[in-house]
């Protein structure tokens, strides 16, 4: 880390840091002085929120960050999922981003991958609403890559 990183949290807010969950009881500012893997509570997707293929991929990528003990399993699930999604989606923008997201995770940049996946939600919603991806395929993807349900 080239410089320090300062994050402000509100009372009751949680942050996931290197696999640990911290909750603050008052407004605080945290200053990270070295490299750290963290995820703010408002970016954490709960299992029940993983209702679309890309949200499922996000959930798996987030598990790489917040569950270090299960990182190998989560990474294997991510690989399986990304391969499946690359064969299912036809949208060129999504396909290009999925390849970039795969490279990010492969180089240990799961946090950046989460941001990129969130950026695809609107396109995915449009595809699903217009049924450009058949509902049967969406259901198959859900079954294949939803092991935490």
UniProtKB/Swiss-Prot annotation:
Keywords linked to the UniProt accession: Bacterial flagellum biogenesis, Repressor, RNA-binding
TM helices/strands, residue ranges: none
Pfam families, per the entry: FlbT (PF07378)
GO annotation terms (biological process): bacterial-type flagellum organization; mRNA catabolic process; negative regulation of bacterial-type flagellum assembly
Keyword Translocase: no
Record carries keyword Repressor: yes
Functional note: Has a post-transcriptional repressor function in flagellum biogenesis. Associates with the 5'-UTR of fljK mRNA and promotes its degradation.
Family the entry assigns: Belongs to the FlbT family.
Name under which the protein is recorded: Probable flagellum biosynthesis repressor protein FlbT
Organism: Rhizobium etli (strain ATCC 51251 / DSM 11541 / JCM 21823 / NBRC 15573 / CFN 42)
């Amino acid at each position: 880390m080239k410089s320090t990183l300062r994050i402000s949290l509100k009372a009751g807010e949680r942050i996931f840091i290197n696999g640990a969950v911290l909750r603050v009881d008052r407004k605080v500012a945290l200053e990270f002085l070295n490299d750290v893997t963290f995820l703010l509570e408002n970016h954490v997707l709960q299992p029940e929120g993983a209702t679309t293929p890309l949200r499922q991929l996000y959930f798996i990528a987030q598990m790489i960050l917040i569950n270090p003990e299960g990182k190998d399993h989560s990474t294997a699930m991510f690989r399986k999922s990304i391969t499946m999604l690359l064969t299912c989606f036809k949208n060129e923008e999504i396909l290009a981003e999925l390849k970039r997201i795969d490279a990010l995770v492969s180089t240990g940049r799961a946090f950046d991958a989460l941001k990129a996946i969130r950026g695809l939600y609107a396109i995915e919603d449009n595809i699903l609403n217009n049924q450009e991806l058949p509902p049967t395929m969406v259901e198959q993807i859900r079954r294949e890559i939803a092991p935490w349900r």
